[in-house]
Each structure stands twice: as C-alpha cells, then as structure tokens.
UniProtKB/Swiss-Prot annotation:
Signal peptide span: none
Protein name: L-aspartate oxidase
Disulfide bridges in this chain: none
Swiss-Prot/TrEMBL cofactor(s): FAD
Protein source organism: Mycobacterium leprae (strain TN)
GO CC annotation: cytoplasm
Biological-process GO terms, alphabetical: 'de novo' NAD biosynthetic process from L-aspartate
Keyword Endoplasmic reticulum part of the UniProt annotation: no
Length: 526
C-alpha cells in the first residue's frame, strides 16, 4: 500500500454539495457527528444540478385538494411499473415536513397570496402541487438556502473522491486527491451524493461535474447499481444552431407546458396529439420519445414550444427568458426551439428508502441513488423532493452508524488498472447508441467499443472523470442490453411493447477481476 501524502479523520464523509449532499451533511451535523463534506469543485459553493433545477418541488400541501395517495399514484404511473410502492408513499408523505425544514433554513417560495404558496402543474401530475421560487429558479433558491445553512460545515473544495475504502464488510473511509496530493479520509460512514451522469452524452442539462463518479465508486466498492437503462431525456432542452456538440445546455422547464404552452413541429402540427391522453403534459419519457420520432420523420433539427399565449412570460419564467435571449430568441414573440437532452438518471446505487446500501456504512442519496422512487421514469419535480427527504434520512442513519461503529481504520488499498475512452468519443458513441431510442445491435456495438477502452493513468480530475464515465457507460449498456422491451425511459426498436414479465430491475455489479460488468436479478436491500 502506498503511503498517503496526508490523512484526516471524521465520523461521516459526504461526497457532494447539492440538495441531497447538504441535506445529509446538515442532518449528520445536527446529530452531533464530526462531518466532512468533499466536493471536486474548486469553489466553496460549486456548480450543482440542484442550482439549475427550474420547475419546483412536488409536495402535497395541507388543506389543498391534493393527497399523498394522489401524488403517489401519479409517481407510480410515471414509473411504469418499476417503482417501490412503500418507498414512494414514504417519501411523498414526508415531503411537506422536508420543505418546511428547508424554509427554516431560509428558503422562500413564490406565493399566490401572502402566506400561501403558489403551485403549478407539470407533466404527469393530476394536481397543481409544484411549489416554486423566483418563477423558474427554484433550484437556485434551494441551493442558496442550503449553502447558507452549510456555513457551519467543514466543506473541502478541490477534493476528488477516488475510492470508497472498506474491508469487505464495513466502510472505513475514502481515498481522495486534492492539491496537496493523494490522501485518506478515514470514517465509518460515507454518503455518496455526487449527482448524475449527464455527460455520458454530447448534450445535457447537467452541470460539468455530472460524470457518473458515484456509480463508479459504488461499483469499485462491490456495491450493486440498478435501473441504469432508465436515463431520462428531458423533452425540452433549448436548441440553438452553432452551440457546439457538447456540454451543458439550458433547460426549458416543464412548467411552461403546465401553464399552457404547446409543442409543435416545423409545420405547426402538434407533436403529442394522439400519443397520450395528457398530450404535451404526458410523462417525460412519452414526450421525449414523441419528439425524437417526429424529428426522425421530418429530418428537422428541433421542434418548437409555443408559449406566446402565456401572459407575463418574462416575469413568470425569467431564467428561461434570459437563456432564450442569449441566443436571440424572444419567447413572447416566437416559439422556442427545443430538443430532448440527457437530464436525469432514474437508476443508480441500490439503497433502501433511508439511503443504506448493502455495504455497512455506505449510504447514497439524490440522483446517484436508486431508492425505487422513480422506477422507469421520474415524475417531474420529484427529484428535489427525494433529495431533501432521503438526504436527511441518510444523514441521520450515517450519524447513528458512526456512533455505533466507533473510529475507522484503513487497512489496505489495492491498486486498480483504469480504462477510459476520450470524452468526446465516449459522448459520440453513447449519443449514437444509447440515447432516446436504442436497438440491440447498437448497444452491442457500444459495449464492444467500451470494452476496448485503453488504459488511463489517473493524474487529475479530467482523467478520473473519463474513467468514471467509461465504467458508468459500460454499466448502462449492460443494463440496456438486458431489457428486451420498451418501458419508461428505455425505448428499444426491436421490442416496442412493454412486457409484464420484465417488470423487474436489472442489477449490475463489477466482476471479481474489476473488468467485466454483469447483469443479475435484483436482491432486496435492507
């Protein structure tokens, strides 16, 4: 075992500073544990997916015409038979408490009248239950409030988590790279809240750090991941000619359709007419697939979101308005050009509803986790809800585990040979073979390409991210190849129908040689 350049000890290590990470860290801190938060970002308040979330938080408000049953029913319908019923009800029922706790941190939501939150509707919801802030800047307000509350925490910037350390039975820390070199943070509890994997693709709504790090860390630790074939492509990502082939692109929030905007093709025809009873407000997987099919049929580069009928658009949706104006579009006068874009991973590290994985002391929360909340397709505005609820639960559970486990000791760190494709090449083959529509031949071609990735020596963040992306891509391809049907976010041209016998999750693990990925039946966690 190499001698580390530095060492540190904590009770709980949290990796990530978005909604789930900070909710977890604050909960563990309130429980009296010594918490260290690691972020690979180079500034205290780094770029997170939470910050860019526009729509809002889906929550059942007391005294409304809504109910936990109704919200759960909508979530289950969107999840296409793949949600965990108990998890869904558990998280939805705790939503209002989690949001009021966020208000206690200083978050302020838009009001319809003084003292009453304004609510809107989004795709797949049967009620107006989406609370929002700043019109379409909810995520920024959630992040602001959590960042303010997190001033009490020990947050380490430019700290890249390389491996979760364990003895095969329990966690004992994290291997980390920072500007001072390679080091170890020993801890009996580790919480992965590192976000998503959008940069598997050339165009995504995700921030630059969404490179599948948590999925790779879990696989290297021998922990199961599941449902990775269900990658949600948001139907409406802003399209502008000449914006390049890669990187983050602005989201055009679903709430705009909730307020009456309609999707049209270049000839003025409805994109979703006859596709789903909810039309433009159908679940995201349905709308994204409809747009993708229309673009393939017409050869057009984009479809259009016509929001000209919405009064006061600029004040209701200032974030979208600003993004549109940046590329010379005035939403009040012309339709907004949009395309589907990689947005959210419905699957992830297998956990229970409290963030516990199969490895004692390892927890996961937020987009990186697969709790069973989202199934095959996430319902709009359920992500911030899950991050708040499960993040808080994971923090409390990690604190309790740390108190019971006592001090952690790192025994040894086995060397690992890493492989990675170049980022642009990886994104090209993923966008070609594992995007909105897939087929078996393309997925096999993708798997073969990924298997031939050359050795990459990790000397910094970019190398590590490419390694993590490549391993995550292999897991996505393996999961997609194992699903011989179309369901939720997974659309397979050879199998266009949903097969009841396939209403089960596919688990992916790393083989003992740390090289091959295999699929197996899902085992119950917790």
């Amino acid at each position: 075992m190499a001698v580390p350049d530095w060492k540190h000890a904590a009770d709980v290590v949290v990796i990530g500073t978005g909604v789930a990470g900070l909710a977890a860290a604050l909960a563990a801190h309130r429980a009296g544990r010594n918490v260290v938060v690691l972020t690979k970002a180079d500034q205290r308040r780094g770029e997170t997916a939470t910050h860019y979330a526009q729509g809002g938080i889906a929550v059942v408000l007391p005294g409304s015409d809504d109910s936990v049953d109704a919200h759960a029913s909508d979530t289950l319908a969107a999840g296409a038979g793949m949600c965990n019923l108990d998890t869904v009800y558990s998280i939805v029922a705790e939503g209002y408490h989690a949001v009021t706790e966020l208000v206690g941190y200083g978050a302020r939501f838009d009001e319809s009248i003084p003292g009453r939150w304004a609510v809107t509707c989004e795709g797949g919801h049967s009620r107006r239950r989406i609370v929002h802030a700043g019109g379409d800047a909810t995520g920024a307000e959630v992040q602001r409030a959590l960042d303010h509350a997190a001033d009490v925490l020990d947050i380490r910037t430019s700290h890249l988590a390389l491996r979760v350390l364990h003895d095969g039975t329990v966690v004992n820390g994290v291997s980390v790279l920072n500007p001072n070199g390679w080091g170890i943070v020993s801890a009996p509890s580790v919480i992965l809240a590192s976000g998503g994997l959008g940069h598997l693709y050339g165009a995504t709504t995700n921030p630059e750090g969404s490179t599948g790090d948590g999925i790779a860390l879990a696989l290297w630790a021998g922990v199961a991941v599941s449902d990775l074939e269900f990658i949600q492509f948001h139907p409406t990502m802003l399209f502008a000619a000449g914006t390049g082939t890669g990187g983050r692109r602005p989201l055009v929030t679903e709430a705009i359709r909730g307020e009456g905007a309609i999707l049209l093709d270049s000839k003025g025809n409805s994109v979703t007419s006859g596709v789903h009873p909810l039309g433009d407000l159908a679940p995201r997987d349905v709308v994204a697939a409809a747009i993708d099919a229309r673009l393939k049929a017409t050869g057009d580069s984009c479809v259009y979101l016509d929001a000209r009928g919405i009064d006061g658009f600029a004040s209701r949706f200032p974030t979208v308005t600003a993004a549109c104006r940046t590329v010379g579009i005035d939403p009040a006068r012309e339709p907004i050009p949009v395309v589907p874009g990689a947005h959210y991973s419905c699957g992830g590290i297998v956990t229970d509803a409290y963030g516990q994985t199969e490895l004692a002391g390892l927890f996961a929360a937020g987009e990186v986790a697969r709790t069973g909340m989202h199934g095959a397709n996430r319902l709009a505005s359920n992500s911030l809800l899950e991050g708040l609820v499960v993040g808080g639960r994971a923090g409390r559970a990690a604190a309790a585990h740390a108190a019971a486990a006592g001090r952690a000791y790192v025994s040894k760190l086995e060397p690992v040979t890493h492989h990675a494709l170049k980022r642009r090449e990886l994104q090209r083959v993923m966008s070609r073979d594992a995007a909105v529509m897939r087929n078996a031949a393309g997925l096999q071609r993708l798997s073969d390409t990924l298997a031939e990735a050359p050795i990459r020596h990790v000397t910094g963040r970019r190398d590590f991210e490419d390694v993590a992306l490549t391993l995550t891509a292999r897991a996505v391809a393996a999961a997609a190849l194992a699903r011989n049907e179309s369901r939720g976010c997974h659309h397979c041209t050879e199998y266009p129908d949903t097969a009841p016998e396939h209403a089960r999750s596919t688990v992916i693990r790393l083989a003992d040689d740390q090289n091959l990925v295999r699929a197996e039946a899902l085992a119950t966690v917790g």
